[in-house]
Amino acid sequence: MSTPTLQTGHVGLNVTDLARSIAFYRQVFDFEVVREQTTGDRRYALLGREGTLMVTLWQQSGGAFATDRPGLHHLSFQVPDVEAVHRAEKVLRELGATLVYDGVVPHGEGASSGGVFFTDPDGIRLEIYAPSGAGAAPAPTQGAPTCGFF
């Protein structure tokens, strides 16, 4: 019996303020709103690109994302090149987003892959990275992937 090929579908995130989160994810990731319900008790938004659903936002939580609890560690998005990472970094700085490290950093010592690490308005840890082009700067963590310890 062969195992069918799997790929990640969409990722669902709980948020505290749907309108704020929709604006953030649209500006940072250039997502389109595929469908949304912004009134009533069941508020949500389905976000994607070119008809492909990528992230769902559910307004059904309070407080901030708890990084010390089991669950999502971080959500990562790959872009084609490091120039796209720098463009995202510029948008993040314009929005006043919290950057975990100063600018684009490699995933590890000697790695050419790397990106920008940041949090959304609810403290959910996010990453935008390129598979190459980030190797000139020193890695911010030693002996482990940068993306694992932020």
State each model region's role.
Residues L13-V55, Q59:
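Core segments of cupin and vicinal oxygen chelate
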Residues R43, G62-G63, G103-G108:
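Short, solvent-exposed loop/turn elements at beta->coil junctions and helix N-caps
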Residues G62, P80, P131-G133:
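Short coil/turn motifs at secondary-structure junctions
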